[in-house]
Regions:
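Metal- or metallocofactor-binding catalytic centers and their adjacent structured scaffolds
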Residues: 40-118
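Flexible C-terminal active-site loop/helix
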Residues: 2-18, 29-32, 275, 296-364
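Active-site mouth loops of central-metabolism enzymes
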Residues: 134-149, 191-197, 241
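Short glycine/serine/threonine/alanine-rich loop segments
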Residues: 74, 121, 238, 289, ...
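Catalytic core of soluble alpha/beta enzymes
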Residues: 167, 172-300, 336
């Protein structure tokens, strides 16, 4: 079996606006973007992958088109590890994180999809098997800076059955408002996206002590200041989560060796796909670090996360971005219900994207 063609497809699906200034990573949020990779083989099997693409899909699509796809054609997709190692070595001059790493992550996911379909098995069974049909999910809310809207968003998440909630606020008033609505029986997480130096982060942790956060995510700039993150963990009094920005298992090794984190957050569309995500889980287990993957994805990267979580057999939470896009790639198949999401049971990733949605929302 050989790869005969590959195509990068950028989707931009408008989202319903329910807040005055919805934002993620500090930028306005108007569409839910998804960069898909379709890989075709001479056996008639098609695999689907997805790269992280929030606000940067055009750049990563260019990396796929100009650097990655030309190195895929004619290769054997059944040789996942050798093929991915070769691609990483060929393209390492472009950096081990960023658009090229995200593009390679999409390739790895597509290769696993192809191999699962070839074997007639869902990916979670190929990775070791599981009896779990549903996984716990948490609601991941957009940043608004508005306490009243934060309260309404938490109320909406609770009504939908979520029992864990993550905020993306940097001001404390919306976080206090969210805690007032959620109460203290609901785990509340806060992703601040690398705003502080270690000293300021420790001071903020002390100001947030009464919030009893389940974790504080990515508190330190730059995010590769592993010793600084470890300082915050040791002196801030709040469990620390990080790794969303990592491009490989080696990045996570630096985090765990520095004793910087309580929770590891590999992102399958950034870290190197399924292959590298599994390495991170094994590494974290060896250092007694809990893994909760970063997974605010629309397409195959979400499915890949579900399969890896299910195969791991642990209570790793699935991140669900609480937005309302005009359309979804899989209908209601992986829409959370009562705080959990179903694990696809079909071969490979289990479900192929809705082609009508692809055609309607495909970016030029």
């Amino acid at each position: 079996m050989l790869i005969t063609a590959a195509q990068a497809i950028l989707l931009q699906i408008p989202c319903e606006q329910r807040s005055p200034q919805p934002a993620l990573y500090g930028r306005p949020w108007r569409t839910l973007d998804s960069l898909l990779l379709r890989v075709e083989t001479d056996a008639g099997i098609t695999g689907w992958g997805e790269a992280f693409s929030f606000h940067g899909g055009l750049t990563t699509r260019a990396a796929l088109d100009s650097l990655v796809i030309p190195n895929l054609i004619g290769r054997d997709p059944s040789q996942i590890v050798p093929l991915m190692n070769d691609l990483q070595r060929r393209l390492h001059l472009y950096g081990r994180t960023g658009p090229v790493a995200c593009a390679l992550s999409a390739v790895d996911i597509a290769l696993w999809d192809i191999n699962g379909k070839m074997a007639g098995m869902p990916l979670f069974r190929m990775l070791g098997g599981s009896t779990r049909t549903h996984l716990p999910a948490y609601a991941s809310l957009l940043r608004t800076g508005d306490p009243a809207h934060a309260s309404r968003s938490v109320e909406a998440a609770l009504k939908r059955g979520f029992r864990s909630i993550k905020l993306h606020e940097v001001d404390l008033d919306p976080v206090h408002a969210a805690r007032d609505v959620a109460g203290y029986d609901i785990p509340l997480m806060l992703d601040v996206d690398c705003p502080w130096n270690p000293g300021d982060a420790i001071e903020m942790c002390r100001r947030m002590a009464d919030l009893e956060l389940y974790w504080l995510e990515e508190p330190v700039w730059p995010p590769e200041n592993y010793d600084g993150i470890a300082d915050v963990r040791s002196n801030g009094g709040i469990p620390i989560a990080a790794g969303v920005l990592a491009g490989s298992a080696m990045d996570f090794k630096h985090l765990v060796v520095a004793e910087a984190i309580d929770f590891a957050q590999p992102s399958v569309g950034k870290v190197g796909g399924v292959t590298e995500l599994r390495k991170v889980i094994a590494l974290a287990s060896a250092y007694n670090v809990t893994v909760h993957p970063h997974s605010p994805y629309l397409g195959p990267a979400l499915l890949a996360t579900l399969h890896v979580n299910a195969a791991a057999g642990e209570d790793m939470l699935v991140e669900h971005l609480l937005v309302e896009p005009e359309a979804t790639l899989y209908g209601a198949a992986v829409r959370p219900f009562n705080g959990s999401v179903a694990v696809p049971q079909g071969p490979g990733l289990g479900i192929d994207p809705d082609m009508a949605v692809l055609e309607r929302y495909r970016a030029p």
